[in-house]
Amino acid sequence: MAAKQVLFSDEARAKMLDGVNTLANAVKVTLGPKGRNVVLDKSFGAPTITKDGVSVAKEIELEDKFENMGAQIVKEVASKTADVAGDGTTTATVLAQALLTEGLKAVTAGMNPMDLKRGIDKATARLVEELKALSKPCSDPKSIEQVGTISANSDATVGKLIADAMAKVGKEGVITVEEGKGFEDELDVVEGMQFDRGYLSPYFATNQENMTTDLENPYILIVDKKISNIRDLLPILEGVSKSGRALLIIAEDVESEALATLVVNNMRGVVKVCAVKAPGFGDRRKAMLEDIATLTGATFVSEDLSMKLEETNMEHLGTASRVQVTKDNTTIIDGAGEKEAIAKRINVIKANIAEANSDYDREKLQERLAKLSGGVAVIKVGAVTEAEMKEKKDRVDDALHATRAAVEEGIVAGGGVALIRAQKALDGLTGENDDQNHGIALLRKAIEAPLRQIVSNAGGESSVVVNQVKANQGNYGYNAANDTYGDMVEMGILDPTKVTRSALQHAASIAGLMITTEAMIGEIKEAAPAMPMGGGMGGMPGMM
């Protein structure tokens, strides 16, 4: 086992604070509308230019073991805030640095670290209650657009794209962000349910120009096994042929003989049909087929449910107003399923999301939820260079997460104003002793740090601005983008309550733990062994 170095009390805390300051100073330059960019070196390819706090934090690894411990702990604040709220990482880092700096001064002065932490925890709980009281719901498109704009570094086009996407697919719909192929940002909306399986044969295509199959008001058969014998399908095919309508078959697979028969009948015009493979794999495939059955009003034909394909008839088929199939995707629009059954299915998926253990499972369940509840929107980010594309995509991702957080828990005045207004909730709050009171006072002062940093990044005098904001009430604050004061909500400067709350809670939690640290243990870096002497080159025969 490698030898360890142990640092105690003030020496340990000083090293830890140095690491925190290194990370926080790199992250906090990005805060606010006039925050600067940070350039990140990559082991391959061009450097990345970003204004995203968590991206900067994730890149930082310090040479000194003990300083690095401090930096990694605060990195956790940024990552946790990003995971929970999707934004507010820089605010959380600035709060943690401010709390820790003042907290360690108090510990050095002889105060009890545990009582300081209890005071901070007590004040945090009161501030969270006050933030919730200050919060206003965010449901109208204008507020959604404003939140998206602020989170995307005051880019109004991004705010509008997100508001449009939410208007089209609903607030719980799936919105994804992709790299576009042009210079302009685009919004693509896929209505209805789409899954990533196309037709099993190009001979099913009805439109030869763009190789798509368009089925109007088709019947839909959903089977979870391979179809190998065409005889099993004969009762269905005869019924569909008599009705004069089309048929979409969704099955695990259709084997060559049965597929050839379907293609021939389709080309001769006996029955208009298209077969596609079922989406997903294993248990997820069955769940997705049940979703499609619910959406279209079909009966899910599965031997697990004691149903055989040869026993099916026209009553087991679902319908939709339109189906479009390409070589890669199938889109079912306006399925004829009962609204009650769809709502019940949606509630089951929501319950599964709440119980999901892994991010992957949760993501797949959310995709299923969106497909059942209204569609998928894709924001395609446009840019001139690849570096700009990556930077912009990060900003759009942040803005999307922040907007979702705003819809979930509401909004408060932005620009650090909500935390300043929440200060009044601490007026009558006292701890059990002087050290706890000092912990409360620490947090009261620390929550001014985000506003101070926004002003500092804009080139202003932070103390003057903070005093001016404190002297007024309500949503009155400082707009760093154009150096003016006014109502932050009217100016469209909003923060999601969830983002501000998460930043505060995570910063207070980590700062409390670091203040109460008394020892640090790290491996001693061993000197690398000296390189061996290189062997001499042997003489070559025939050389003079």
From Swiss-Prot:
Lyase: present as a keyword of the record? no
Domain of life (superkingdom): Bacteria
Q: Kindly state one GO CC term assigned in the UniProt record.
A: cytoplasm
Catalysed conversion reaction: ATP + H2O + a folded polypeptide = ADP + phosphate + an unfolded polypeptide
Q: Which CDD domains match?
A: GroEL (cd03344)
Q: Could you say which enzyme class this protein belongs to?
A: isomerase
Q: Which GO terms describe its molecular function?
A: ATP binding; ATP-dependent protein folding chaperone; isomerase activity; unfolded protein binding
Physiological role: Together with its co-chaperonin GroES, plays an essential role in assisting protein folding. The GroEL-GroES system forms a nano-cage that allows encapsulation of the non-native substrate proteins and provides a physical environment optimized to promote and accelerate protein folding.
- UniProt similarity note: Belongs to the chaperonin (HSP60) family.
Fill in the subunit field for this protein. Forms a cylinder of 14 subunits composed of two heptameric rings stacked back-to-back. Interacts with the co-chaperonin GroES.
Q: What is this protein called?
A: Chaperonin GroEL
Gene label: groEL
